[in-house]
């Protein structure tokens, strides 16, 4: 992981930052197989980027995804707003398998996440944070961030104001992810994508 990050730092793709302390045995949330390891979100992502703060409109060149477009781990293209700002379009255009994290919302919904699959070109708004996965399947990370374990973390670290709650990027970086080998991540994703539609039909 660290070797891969060093390559990206040398290439100028990410900035060098002080690494988080190693996860001790006492800090591990639960038992995982020997071939897996505990990592922080910060260890497995290229960067965490806040979205545009510029005003959007009902018409424009490109959709601006907002927190209402994140539902059940997927992007929903309803009630879209748009931007024609070329600088923002260049800076905030989403790439396949980027994850969007909702940093500000009600206390029940703050922290919700969805994966972007290039259904249509889009950028993202300021209440969202882009997570760019590295050495991890974006789909696997997205499924981890739909679990009760993840939601318990969000409820624990959120900061509450009068009408909304917030989880900043520093708290997101410290979320601990159970990381299997990449081939196993892909098998887990394939199995979930096989059985979850069946579960939905039973509801």
Regions found by a protein language model. Give the residues of each.
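Sequence-specific dsDNA recognition surfaces
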Residues: 23-27, 42-54, 68-98
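Non-catalytic DNA-recognition/assembly elements of restriction-modification systems
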Residues: 22-50, 182-190, 195-203
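Extended, domain-scale alpha-helical bundle/helix-rich regions
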Residues: 1-20
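Interdomain signal-transducing alpha-helices
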Residues: 131, 141, 145, 185-188
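Short, ligand-facing micro-motifs at secondary-structure edges
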Residues: 70-82, 99-124, 139-143, 151-158, ...
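A short glycine-rich beta-alpha junction/loop motif
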Residues: 121-129, 139, 159-179
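Short coil/turn segments at secondary-structure boundaries
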Residues: 17-23, 54-61, 156-158
């Amino acid at each position: 992981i660290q070797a891969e990050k060093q390559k990206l730092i040398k290439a100028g793709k990410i900035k060098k930052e002080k690494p988080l302390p190693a996860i001790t045995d006492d800090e591990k949330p639960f038992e995982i197989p020997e071939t897996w390891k505990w990592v922080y979100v910060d260890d497995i992502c290229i960067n965490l980027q806040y979205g545009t703060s510029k005003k959007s409109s009902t018409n424009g060149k490109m959709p601006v995804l907002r927190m209402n477009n994140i539902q059940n781990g997927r992007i929903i293209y309803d009630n879209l707003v748009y931007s024609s700002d070329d600088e923002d379009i260049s800076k905030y255009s989403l790439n396949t398998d980027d994850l969007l994290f909702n940093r500000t919302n009600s206390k029940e919904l703050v922290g919700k996440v969805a994966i972007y699959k290039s259904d249509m070109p889009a950028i993202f708004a300021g209440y969202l944070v882009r997570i760019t996965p590295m050495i991890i399947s974006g789909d696997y990370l997205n499924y981890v961030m739909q679990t009760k374990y993840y939601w318990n973390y969000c409820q624990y670290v959120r900061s509450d104001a009068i009408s909304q709650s917030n989880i900043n990027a520093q708290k997101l970086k410290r979320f601990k992810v159970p990381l299997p080998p990449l081939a196993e991540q892909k098998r887990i994703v394939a199995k979930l994508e096989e059985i979850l539609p069946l579960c939905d039909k039973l509801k």
